[in-house]
Amino acid sequence: MKKQKIVAIYGKGGIGKSSTASNVAAACAEAGKKVMIIGCDPKSDSSITLLRGKRIPTILDLLREGVDVQEKDVVFEGYAGVKCVEAGGPEPGIGCAGRGIIVAIQKLKSISGDLLKEQDLIIYDVPGDIVCGGFVAPVRKGYVNEAYVLTSGEYMPLYAANNICKGLSKIGMPLSGVICNSRNASREEEIVRKFSEEIGSQLMAFIPKRQIVQDCEREGYSVMEKAPDSDIAEVYRQLGKSILTNEKKVMASHLSDERLREMTK
């Protein structure tokens, strides 16, 4: 029986989780893996670049409309065969997005259980600067077997990453690695590598800042589809391979605020 990788990618809002998740999904699918991406952000944009700019109905929106949701209503095939799902979020100012994720995932499992089992890699793109009770649901409910944190080398993204590590440890979830999505900060790779080591984990990849990523997104494409020969596409391919073969999991420690500030000076 094949070993299925089910990963959650956490990180500060705006750090590039959706971009990273969608490009890694595309890279792994190009390599012949069966891949599904499940967007858990109320913005519902995790899969948009895999679908050439098309927004898809979210599970929670359809449930609110009283639709008898079926697999064909919420699972769409994107670039390279990636299966795309958006959980959606609550109406603005009403309800908890984290609890909504639980409802959406449970619905998906009930209508697409066989499809979920067929996947080699499932990526949950999870929002939030902290791991609250709701957003940690994919982990706590056993839907996820690996967690990664995405950050850059600046203080605030590292502060968020540090809090996420603290939250994961509190619920007994090991961390599988740290990913640096560069903002072109000074000594960025060195800082994030040091952070990874000091919390007991590993730096999985350093993703350099490239304008082509934003250019592709504006046109509704992933880098893997629009610019497959770019250097950044190769970075995503290597990160995908690393995630697929990674076996390291540690109960991450967290750093003091003083240490974070010292590290990012």
Swiss-Prot record:
Catalysed reaction per UniProt? Ni-sirohydrochlorin a,c-diamide + 3 AH2 + ATP + H2O = 15,17(3)-seco-F430-17(3)-acid + 3 A + ADP + phosphate
Q: What is its cofactor? A: [4Fe-4S] cluster
Q: Where along the sequence do coiled-coil regions lie?
A: none
Q: Which CDD domains match?
A: NifH (cd02040)
Task: List the Gene Ontology MF annotations in alphabetical order.
Answer: ATP binding; iron-sulfur cluster binding; ligase activity; metal ion binding; oxidoreductase activity
Q: Please give one Pfam family short name.
A: Fer4_NifH
Subunit comment: Homodimer. The Ni-sirohydrochlorin a,c-diamide reductive cyclase complex is composed of a NifH homolog component CfbC and a NifD homolog component CfbD.
Q: What does this protein do?
A: Involved in the biosynthesis of the unique nickel-containing tetrapyrrole coenzyme F430, the prosthetic group of methyl-coenzyme M reductase (MCR), which plays a key role in methanogenesis and anaerobic methane oxidation. Catalyzes both the six-electron reduction of the tetrahydroporphyrin ring system and the gamma-lactamization of the c-acetamide side chain of Ni-sirohydrochlorin a,c-diamide to yield 15,17(3)-seco-F430-17(3)-acid (seco-F430), the last intermediate in the biosynthesis of the coenzyme F430.
Family label: Belongs to the NifH/BchL/ChlL family.
The protein here is known as Ni-sirohydrochlorin a,c-diamide reductive cyclase complex, component CfbC
Q: Which organism is it from?
A: Methanosarcina acetivorans (strain ATCC 35395 / DSM 2834 / JCM 12185 / C2A)
